[in-house]
């Protein structure tokens, strides 16, 4: 897909951080917010390092398995070197690699929060864009994603910090009719581009339709994930706010019908992400190779596998499996 759910998670995380640790603690000492943020960042850093080492050791046990995730360190590598590279964040392995990005972003968050407390949001914007523009100067790859993806997280922090002003501006400067029109246009844009994206990707990778394959492979570089191109950012913005409009419009109904199913997953997001990383890791080892499933199994089997994986994660939350060990 030209935009993934990951971008939305980073944006939401930034929004929540800006609102909960920024705006709501505005009358509290800055030291309090900083301590809470850095404590969370340290926790994520420790978990990211431990999971990398654990997945590496487990991966060595399945070295000849075709479903083993790519990028694992060679078993011949001195273990102390792997530990050092893990601690310095130059090596990451497994399906929980986003934790290290969160840890890095949270480390920089107090600086952003300090600027926001002084009304210097535009300084944050300029610095963030400058850092984002540095990515093309690097060798590229996962070790430099922090440079490009931070623009999403810190944009979220700005939005969260100024959420009351933004909502007041929205209601005060746009009539109800105008708000409805804008919301519907956003949702229509989201649906239209999402369907087009689905047809292109699945037409190229699964249905093997030649014209769609040509369009897809000609377009994919414009939406490069690691670089986080401006086109991907723009499309992600449309998708996020289009989906937000839908969720806000039907929030009460969704809560009534799906609240018991979704709320436990949302309130234990770090735990869910950790458990999910193990489910995905072993699913690829014993069910089908990892990259990508849609090219190997029929769509309905993939659907069953996906639903089963989600059910396993939900069951783990429901049973509070290892709640005292795995951070939440």
Model-derived regions: residue spans:
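Alpha-helical transmembrane segments and their immediate juxtamembrane cytosolic regions
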Residues: 1-328
């Amino acid at each position: 897909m030209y935009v993934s759910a990951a971008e939305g998670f980073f944006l939401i995380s930034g929004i929540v951080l800006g609102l909960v640790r920024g705006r709501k603690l505005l009358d509290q000492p800055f030291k309090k917010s900083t301590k809470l943020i850095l404590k969370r960042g340290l926790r994520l850093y420790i978990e990211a390092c431990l999971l990398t080492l654990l997945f590496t050791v487990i991966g060595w046990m399945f070295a000849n398995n075709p479903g083993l995730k790519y990028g694992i360190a060679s078993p011949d590598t001195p273990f102390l070197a792997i530990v050092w590279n893990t601690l310095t964040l130059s090596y990451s392995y497994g399906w929980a690699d986003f934790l290290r990005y969160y840890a890095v972003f949270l480390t920089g968050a107090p600086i952003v929060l300090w600027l926001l407390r002084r009304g210097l949001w535009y300084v944050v914007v300029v610095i963030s864009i400058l850092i984002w523009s540095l990515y093309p100067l690097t060798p590229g790859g996962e070790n430099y994603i922090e440079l490009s993806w931070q623009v999403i997280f810190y944009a979220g922090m700005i939005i969260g910090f100024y959420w009351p002003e933004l909502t007041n501006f929205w209601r005060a400067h746009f009539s109800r009719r105008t708000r409805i029109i804008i919301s519907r246009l956003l949702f229509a844009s989201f649906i239209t581009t999402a369907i087009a994206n689905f047809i292109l990707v699945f037409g190229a990778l699964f249905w093997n339709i030649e014209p769609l394959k040509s369009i897809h492979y000609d377009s994919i570089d414009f939406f490069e994930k690691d670089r986080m191109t401006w086109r991907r950012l723009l499309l992600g913005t449309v998708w996020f706010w289009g989906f937000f409009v839908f969720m806000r419009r039907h929030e009460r109904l969704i809560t009534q019908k799906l609240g018991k199913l979704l709320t436990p997953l949302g309130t234990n997001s770090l735990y869910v992400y950790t458990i999910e990383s193990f489910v995905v890791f072993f699913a690829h080892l014993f069910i089908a190779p990892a990259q990508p499933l849609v090219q190997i199994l029929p769509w309905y089997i993939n659907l069953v596998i996906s639903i089963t994986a989600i059910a396993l994660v939900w069951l783990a939350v429901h049973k509070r499996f290892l709640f005292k060990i795995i951070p939440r």
